[in-house]
Amino acid sequence: MRAVLEAADIAVVALYFILVMCIGFFAMWKSNRSTVSGYFLAGRSMTWVAIGASLFVSNIGSEHFIGLAGSGAASGFAVGAWEFNALLLLQLLGWVFIPIYIRSGVYTMPEYLSKRFGGHRIQVYFAALSLLLYIFTKLSVDLYSGALFIQESLGWNLYVSVILLIGMTALLTVTGGLVAVIYTDTLQALLMIIGALTLMVISMVKIGGFEEVKRRYMLASPDVASILLKYNLSNTNACMVHPKANALKMLRDPTDEDVPWPGFILGQTPASVWYWCADQVIVQRVLAAKNIAHAKGSTLMAGFLKLLPMFIIVVPGMISRIVFADEIACINPEHCMQVCGSRAGCSNIAYPRLVMTLVPVGLRGLMMAVMIAALMSDLDSIFNSASTIFTLDVYKLIRKSASSRELMIVGRIFVAFMVVISIAWVPIIVEMQGGQMYLYIQEVADYLTPPVAALFLLAIFWKRCNEQGAFYGGMAGFVLGAVRLILAFTYRAPECDQPDNRPGFIKDIHYMYVATALFWITGLITVIVSLLTPPPTKDQIRTTTFWSKKTLVTKESCSQKDEPYKMQEKSILQCSENSEVISHTIPNGKSEDSIKGLQPEDVNLLVTCREEGNPVASMGHSEAETPVDAYSNGQAALMGEREREKETENRSRYWKFIDWFCGFKSKSLSKRSLRDLMDEEAVCLQMLEETPQVKVILNIGLFAVCSLGIFMFVYFSL
């Protein structure tokens, strides 16, 4: 009989969640959620340790413990290639992309594309694509993997488990912004690594060491005769029950069905650039660093941590197949259905089955708590990032006059919509990719993200790339990828004991080769159209490319009337005159004279003085508010007129508490913004500075982590 959580395990789970909730409420109480950097970027105060841990946990959620271990059980070392590839791409993020994002003064990735190319077409395209990917590769997979853990530990129905997860996540979602997320991620990273290392050691000891794992894995085949007798099955054509001959190699032959090395290098790697260098959930955390040194340090730390999943997740998945060969390597769809409820295969239960069997009471509960809490942290981040992108980059373009409260309501309705679609998509995930969930994620992403990677790389490394080229190249790649994705869902892979009658261009062309074609076709079309159309303006490439990221800013650069985030000297002085609490001396010691010396380019945010008769307010562009002043990572910052402020003050204590708890209430902008913004700008101006000593240390770390990543590729591929 399979083990289930006992009273001690449940107590550990309850204590863990209480601790996480306390951290969330503490962060909600202490942090300022009403400003850009307060809620969205954690005040730009995070250190490299906290961000590095958060990057690791944001990526290695329960879906990785399910998916990586499951693919390890099904096909061996191959899936570890994604982890070592991520190790290298994280450094591309820290050394190339993040300095440009900081210099550009952007907060969302669609916003960067809009600033780099101008217009809104590409911004809306990327926002819509990001939302599709969040629903079909992140939310639905997270819900399924977390529910599978609950199903394995408590024996509950899969969909009951999904509903429970959503309810628990709703409790954590309101607790305090990016500060709370990063703090809880740090705790989860520590416990996750300790728990996973403990399970690895226990399972290794049981098997007899790493070399014994490799030997016994190649012999881990189910006892077909015993299974037919036990489950009363007919002796039909059995699925592939023996381990693959090349299971102990990572990068494999060009015709391999898992990881063909040309497809991985030329197609999968560019596709992964989207996730590690242009995905809102990942980039948002690194932008919270107090300076560029901490940002680079966080990617180094996360890179070193990415060495672990191969050993603490993939290898235990292989051990699970050794120990539970008759269940993990089910012999036909009927057998698989009886074992795990999926006709496509049972490799996804490899890790939870190992946890529930080998881990002692107490530690078992801690492992389950960490897995589910990490999942809910992922869901929280995805909900906030997705609602922010939809509200700022899509809805606000459609309805520019929308109030802050309207934006807030729309964001929450959109989150509910995403949850419904994600739950409806779970059955598709269960059956895709022969039950290997991680490969499902990669397949869907590889059909949609290579064009995005091509656009970001060209935008950063090629100044001549313009809006027309990027738009038509991106749309061509998207249409081709979407057609291939629709065909993949239309011509579903048959069950393993049935003949494959799909068209040759579906079954014989690996999705990584499709990704390769999409990436290079997009790049080629973008280059050709860009060369045939006018080049981008100097203002568009001044701070948004790799070659210009260290150039000085000129005074005329911010003279554009349509610049949405400018703050003029006149605004500063008049706001300080009209404020009751702001003196003529800035908190960092700068006087008005020194403020006059600031170049307009150095200031990203608008100070608005919404008072009658104030000439500054007459500037009045509805789009002049910064995105997160209007809607900060899913939380609205109310910036109404003084009349609305007075009305709010007269409301009951109950409603005041509700406003505070949900992050709806903020201080008057006219009373707080000058102090806050000048502090933020002083920090931003220093973020790109590095001392020579720190630069040397970081470069040594860069060399070390990249060398280790390349060594791992070579060691596991030869």
Swiss-Prot record:
InterPro entries: Na/Glc_symporter_sf, Na/solute_symporter, Na/solute_symporter_CS, SMIT. The keyword Phosphoprotein applies. Residues 30-38, 111-123, 184-186, 325-353, 431-443, 533-695 are cytoplasmic. GO terms for molecular function: D-glucose:sodium symporter activity. The keyword Transmembrane helix applies. Highly expressed in kidney, placenta, and brain and at a lesser extent in thymus, lung, bladder, and testes. Expressed in the choroid plexus epithelium (at protein level). It comes from the Eukaryota. The record marks G24, R285 as: Implicated in sodium coupling. It holds the Pfam family SSF. The modification Phosphoserine is found at S594, S632. Disruption phenotype: Mutant embryos show brain myo-inositol deficiency and central apnea and die soon after birth due to hypoventilation. Its main location: membrane. It catalyses: myo-inositol(out) + 2 Na(+)(out) = myo-inositol(in) + 2 Na(+)(in); scyllo-inositol(out) + 2 Na(+)(out) = scyllo-inositol(in) + 2 Na(+)(in). NCBIfam families: sss. Interacts with KCNQ2 (via the pore module). Interacts with KCNQ1; this interaction is direct. Forms coregulatory complexes with ion channels KCNQ2-KCNQ3 and KCNQ1-KCNE2. This is Sodium/myo-inositol cotransporter. It comes from Mus musculus (Mouse).
